[in-house]
């Protein structure tokens, strides 16, 4: 599944990068170049893999892998590609709640308020696209969460586990054994 998701990302990114050549007013923007041209000196480019760029924001201690940035009809959008099962995809009506913090983080880091989510049904490659406009309130709320988290980290105290956190959210967490105590 991971490899098929990666393959789908690469194919979509490649298709987007070729749109301008066939007359569509859509340009795939190199993220590292965008960071440099916009003088986003607070961001570190940690690497590239195909179209994706690994970025690190030291002040917030956040690293992330950006699928891309597109410029469509003169406007910039952060591109975030998601693949999902037919069951989730069929009922998809907007950006998943689980993806809001991710979009908000990317928006803060890249200075772009609009995120284009492209959800692909991994069973038949059908697609749905949604634009999420990240508001100042969303950014303030996320920064508040990061600050709270940093306080726990600096005090070497694990934060209380939120009641609504899913098991999936804990899968790659370095502290999941501490939470179970």
Predicted regions and their residues:
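Short, glycine/acidic-rich beta->alpha junctions
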Residues: 60-61, 95-99
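Metal-dependent nuclease catalytic cores that hydrolyze phosphodiester bonds in DNA/RNA
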Residues: 1-78, 85
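Metal-dependent nuclease catalytic regions and adjoining charged, substrate-binding loops involved
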Residues: 91-96, 109-181
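Short beta-strand-loop-alpha-helix junction that forms the active-site gateway
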Residues: 81-94
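A short linear-motif detector with a strong N-terminal bias
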Residues: 47-49, 94-97
């Amino acid at each position: 599944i991971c490899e098929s998701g990666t393959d789908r990302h690469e194919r979509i990114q490649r298709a987007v990068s070729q749109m301008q050549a066939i007359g569509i007013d859509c340009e795939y923007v190199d993220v590292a170049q965008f960071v440099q041209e916009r003088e986003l000196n607070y961001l570190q480019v940690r690497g590239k893999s195909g179209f994706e760029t690994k970025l690190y924001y030291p002040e917030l201690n956040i690293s992330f892998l950006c699928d891309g940035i597109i410029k469509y009809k003169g406007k910039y959008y952060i591109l975030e590609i998601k693949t999902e099962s037919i069951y989730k995809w069929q009922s998809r009506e907007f950006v998943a709640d689980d993806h809001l913090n991710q979009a908000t983080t990317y928006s803060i880091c890249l200075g772009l308020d609009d995120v284009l989510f492209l959800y692909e049904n991994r069973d038949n490659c059908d697609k749905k696209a949604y634009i999420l406009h990240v508001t100042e309130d969303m950014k303030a709320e996320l920064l508040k969460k990061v600050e709270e988290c940093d306080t726990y980290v600096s005090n070497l105290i694990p934060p209380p586990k939120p009641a609504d956190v899913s098991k999936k959210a804990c899968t790659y967490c370095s502290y999941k054994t501490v939470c179970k105590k």
